[in-house]
Design a protein with these regions (language model features):
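C-type cytochrome heme-c attachment and multiheme electron-transfer modules
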Residues: 252-274
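Iron-sulfur cluster-binding cysteine motifs and their immediate structural context
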Residues: 26, 191-214, 220-223, 229-256
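A short, flexible beta-alpha/helix-coil linker loop
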Residues: 175, 218-219
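SIR2/sirtuin NAD+-dependent deacylase catalytic core
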Residues: 188
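Auxiliary alpha/beta "docking" domains used to position bulky ligands
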Residues: 1-185, 231
């Protein structure tokens, strides 16, 4: 059995801002909702979402012998995430202005896994950073990190939605698990629904990826059927920058997530060199 306190200390030492621990289980309620969402065609711009559904809702089908999921989060908010002036035509999602977070978080998780293997010789496990059919936002809720906001993003009390997630899936149980996050803290706020430039948030927690600027500029080439991109050329932060929880969130503390450029001042030559 693994010490939950030891896991969280490793996460802190690795540089993560948040860490929660949850037992592996079948997320049946989420599977029912997700299948209904797919049936309505809201995910048709992201065909890969229809694959590996059995693994997506039960991590035990993804990692043999899995018993525990450790969900870690790191804040990435920077001053450039506060929003763009009206009329700006070169908007880029806040997270994309810094280094690619995938290898950064992968190294952090790898450091944790190596330490756990030394401490618990019989342990095996895998690390994940947005690279597998893992329902990471819901796992974060199950691990007590936050709730799902009306814009369908994980919202944490400390850092809002400006967090990047990574997971450790382990084959031993923990001596303590965190309680799932109870309730939501959006109140009557509708800022994200009312601010989406393309109306992609068709209902609270329901996203039509065919309209979502972030999905269409990152996951799939845009076409004439897409509404006006409102100046966004990679990703979109509108449903985040308007959120009160994000407006009061602190800036990140890791140099890995310092912006590499300012889209408001970057030259044409610098754009082409990227």
């Amino acid at each position: 059995m693994i010490s939950g306190q030891y896991i969280k200390k490793l996460a802190e030492n690795a540089g993560f801002d948040l860490c929660g621990i949850t037992p592996c289980k079948h997320l049946a309620e989420n599977e029912s909702y997700f299948r209904e969402w797919l049936a309505k065609g809201y995910g048709s711009s992201l065909e890969y979402l229809e694959r590996n559904l059995d693994k997506r809702f039960d991590v035990r089908h993804l990692v043999e012998g899995a018993q525990t999921v450790v969900v870690c989060a790191v804040s990435y908010k920077n001053p450039l995430g506060e929003g763009y002036p009206p009329g700006c035509r070169t908007k880029i999602a806040s997270y994309a202005r810094s280094r690619d977070y995938h290898p950064v978080l992968k190294r952090m998780l790898g450091t944790m896994l190596e330490a756990l293997r030394r401490q618990y010789p019989g342990l095996t496990g895998r690390t994940f950073v947005d690279t597998a059919p893992l329902l990471e936002k819901q796992l974060a809720v199950e691990a007590g990190l936050g709730w799902i906001g009306r814009q369908s993003l994980l919202l944490t009390p400390q850092y809002g939605s400006y967090v990047l997630l990574g997971e450790l899936v382990l084959t031993l149980p923990s001596d303590q698990y965190d309680a799932p996050f109870a309730g939501a803290r959006c109140g009557r706020c509708r800022n994200c629904l009312d601010s989406c430039p393309t109306g992609a948030i068709v209902a609270p927690k329901v996203i039509d990826t065919n309209r979502c600027i972030s999905c269409r500029t990152i996951e799939k080439e845009s076409d004439s059927a897409l509404p006006d991109l409102d100046g966004w050329i990679f990703g979109c932060d509108r449903c985040q920058s308007c959120c009160p929880h994000n407006q009061k969130a602190p800036m990140h503390r890791s140099p890995h997530f310092d912006p590499l450029f300012d889209p408001l001042t970057i030259s044409d030559r610098e754009w082409l060199a990227m």
